Amino acid sequence: MQKFWSKTISVSEAVELAVKILKESIELKAIDIPIDRSIKMISSESIKCPIDLPPYNNSAVDGYAVRSIDTIGATQLNPVKLRVKCSMDTGDPPDKCGVLRDSEAVEVGTGAPLPEGADAVVMYEDSLKVGDYIEVFRQIAPFDNVNRAGDDFKAGEEAISEGTQLTVFHIGLLASLGLKNVRVYRPLKALILPTGSELVEPGELLQLGKKYSSTDYIVASLLREAGFIKVIKLSPTPDHVEEVKKALLKGLEKADLAITIGGSSIGSRDVVHRVIDSEGLWVFRGVALRPGRTTSLGLINRKPVFILSGNPVAAWAGFTAIIKPSIYKLYRSSPPVEPSIVATVSERIVNVAGYRSYVRVALSSNGLKYFVKPYMIHGSSYLSSIIKAHGYVVIPEEVEGYDVGEEVVVQLFTTRHLHVA
């Protein structure tokens, strides 16, 4: 029997088709939420600054606000003498000390507003307090030691563009602008359905011939890691067409899309494709991806159903290469950039012509640079091939591999792996 992935499409084609289907079947809606609940959500609109940041000129140091023109010619041997008329600190109104006039100074703390007339700040280190006066030992230029209004962001400037995934710093910016709420796209609802008569939930008694369901937990965690996806995870369903169909149809009533785990081939016990055959239609069946070539996409009741392998590494590759970028494109965004390093190949990394390969790799270092070699090329069912690997290398379809001595980009599974022996 010929397997359906003998006519696979490229990863790029799969992503393009998936994005098209997602856009046709899922309506993006905007919601307003408090900024302190918006971490990793996707901005649904361009946000303009309503005010300058900082909102007023303020001191960048502790010292004295002055008119820079009054310090012309100041040196250690020929200091300029200025009268200290007042002091200001953070939170004081800018008019507290009135207008700064000729040969006057105002003592200021870091962050304090500059009084009208002042255009620079003399640091304590460049002055000496003598009674009600200071001696200034250095000539300073206009706006020295001053945070100018609008230096950070100007009123009317775009602070956050549509499709931005909000980070802790974006939330800080929104708070600095006085915005209590932010408009974001509503979370996506994703159904996860693991299939397999051999699967039992973690915590249950493990009988001979059974194994704990784990790939569904990996995919659920990958979805939750995105931050803007609500996961509906079902318990494992046996390899019976009617049971899989029932679980899938009922689950899709509350979800925007589904991801099935396992049953992605056409063996006698791989029933997911039969459910798509009977209840929906295929968008693509199989992708030129290693591991993960059985990754597929169908439609049931106009809702996308992604099919991933039950093997954890193949499921991870299918999710990373196809599902993740497709969902981000739906949200007019792009996935966060993963940490990476450049390393020199110490053992040839091979590829199958026409396939995009996600090769798990191990790193080593001589103290000057990093070296990389394949780690467990085969074994997409082995979690150790990811747990014990330092990262992975993506080999494009048109590249047959990387030879010893070539430099490649290694995507790191975690930055703690940067320090290797």
Please give the residue ranges for each predicted region.
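Helix-rich terminal scaffold detector
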Residues: 2-12, 180-308, 312-322
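Short, glycine/charged-enriched hinge/interface segments at domain edges or termini
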Residues: 2-6, 65-235, 249-250, 376, ...
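Intrinsically disordered, low-complexity, positively charged segments
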Residues: 7-74, 166
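Flexible glycine/proline-rich
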Residues: 8, 12-15, 26, 31, ...
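Conserved active-site and cofactor/substrate-binding residues in soluble primary-metabolism enzymes
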Residues: 9-13, 30-33, 61, 115, ...
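Structural signal for hydrophobic packing residues in well-ordered secondary-structure cores
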Residues: 18-26, 46, 114, 157-164, ...
